[in-house]
Amino acid sequence: MQTNNKMAVAPVGKLIWQMSILPLISMFLQYSYNLIDSAFVARLSENALTAVSLSFPITTLMNATSIWIGVGVNVLIAGYLGERKQDEANTTVTHGLLLAFGVGALLNLLSLLIMRPYFGALTNNEEIYQLSLAYMSICSFMQIPNMVHIAIQKMIQATGNMIAPMWFQIAGVVVNFVFDPLLIFGIGVFPAMGILGASVATVAGYLLSMILAFALLLGKKQKVRIKIKEFHIQKRMIARIFALGLPSFIMNALSSFMVTFVNLFLVAYSDTAIAFFGAYFKVQQLIVMTVNGLIQGCLPIMRFNYGAGNRDRLHSAFRYGTALVSGMMILGTLTVNFFPAQLLELFTASEAMRSFGISAMRIMAASYLFCGLSTMISTYFQATEKVGSSIAIQLCRQLLFLVPALWCLNKLFQLNGIWLAFPVAETATMLIALIIMAWHRHKNIL
């Protein structure tokens, strides 16, 4: 064991906070984009909020693809630097940028092609349909800057620099926050663009993040650089990038399919129900994914001590992380339960939305603790090289248990059944996660 490494000797509790604070802030900033957009757009009309809500699965899938390439590049560069293979690390940087631009352009084109049939399947309201097209036609162009800035962020983080990438993320969020009201409502010299203004502000935020990311990458002090001289495309390296980032893509993409599936149930009730779920889900994502930043900080600690054969510190990190995650999820649950009306007011909720939305938020918030526990167990499996078990838990959470629960409870309790499906699915997932963990312990492989 490397006794001079802080992963091996630092107090576990203090180490988790040190490793978690930046990912936690990063996740909070990343998921504040959609919440800010929705909060301002809701002041235009409920139909505008519904349009943004219908667009959310597409933008989520785009983000998942960005994370796919970003994580793959991150893991590959970190490995090469650890092996002191500087040239291979620089070659990976160039491949990552080419993939970010190429895949980003492809997704831009695909989103423009599918958005008409996609929105047509989810709403019969002509105004919502047109607003959705208007919003997504601009947001489609966010994919290249989004994918490039996330790729560069992960490249720089692979060198051990966790702080600098956070600043260009903050800059993008600030631009989005400032320009949203200016462009949506036409304040001062800015034109009133309505829902188009929200999408323009989002793209502007990502563009600034990309420009600052490039400036940072091209700086003299960076440990990795873009390789141009004697560069040639390596198919094996591209395949490794995609393979290494695939688990992260699956975990992030599942929420996109889940939201689309829920919307297909909600469309049978009302557009207000879709607008509500879109607003609520952004609040939930902000809470859950911020906590996920804490979990990300636990992962390298558990992974290091598993590799070092230090089972006591591995289990200590898992227990301490589980306690912190539970505490934060309970805090999130209490916040939603005590302040549902105030949270809905962020989205200028109509009386019709409030009539079912307040109780619906309280029902769905009951799932947070179970979600946190199952995600922590899934991360433990990821750290101990049991990727199959890790992915199985994520599939249970957002697909295998949720879909049947939605179908059955919708039949039994109508609209309330849809909200009940979330805590039911999360509880079942947590039980399965505990059973899988007990099985691994019984086999003495944990």
Name every feature range the model reports, one short phrase each.
Residues 1-23, 77-144, 190-246, 302-367, ...:
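Short alpha-helical transmembrane segments in multi-pass integral membrane proteins
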Residues 32-50, 119-126, 182-193, 253-286, ...:
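Helix-terminus/linker motif at the lipid-water interface of multi-pass membrane proteins
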Residues 61-64, 176-180, 210-214, 286-289, ...:
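Hydrophobic transmembrane alpha-helices of multi-pass small-molecule transporters
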Residues 18-37, 138, 149, 172, ...:
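Transmembrane helical elements of multi-pass membrane transporters/channels
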Residues 75, 116, 154, 181, ...:
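Small-residue-mediated transmembrane helix hinge/kink sites in multi-pass secondary transporters
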Residues 49-109, 146-165, 276-334, 338-340, ...:
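Small-residue-rich hydrophobic transmembrane alpha-helices
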Residues 70, 139-157, 165-173, 198-213, ...:
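Short runs within selected transmembrane alpha-helices of multi-pass transporters and secretion channels
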Residues 111, 154, 180, 184, ...:
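Structural signal for membrane-spanning alpha-helices in multi-pass inner-membrane proteins
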